[in-house]
Amino acid sequence: EIMLAHRIQQGLLLQKALTCGLEIAEQAAELGITVADVLVCCGGGGLTSGIALALEQDAPNMRVRPVEPEGFDDVCRSLISGKIERNPTTLGSLCDAIVTLSPGQLTFPIMQRLCHAGITVNEEKALHAVQLAHDRLKITVEPGGAVALAAALFHGDQITSDCLIAVASGGNVDRDVFERA
């Protein structure tokens, strides 16, 4: 029964993420962008797979790329192996909001079908992205929600499109962590 509740939660998050994907497609179309790498912070895959589903229909040339913290890259490894991989623990990361033991049972098949290679970033880069988001973009984002921005800023060598969209999510950052950034 716990697993059933977890699957329901994944489904609800996936539905909410569809809205984000639709907004990305709409704004990209307004700007004339038809091809882009779309970097999405990824834990269990609800946000990532929901965005991928929306873009599949409305912007099929967008390349959704999950982004995870180094050492907690279960989705990236799962996409490479073709089967669900597990992290040994969920403890020990500043990006705790997106750290999961494994991709979701509902979300992994969607990501497997629709997502491109994932990217991992270290915590130092995630913290730097938190700081830059605050200082330059005037938004507060937690480290886990800043990993996509960190990938955009510091892993340009892994970006394959001329256009780039990075999803920043979650503003629940502890004062101590924010001050470290």
Model-predicted regions and their roles:
Residues 1-181:
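PLP-dependent amino-acid enzyme catalytic core
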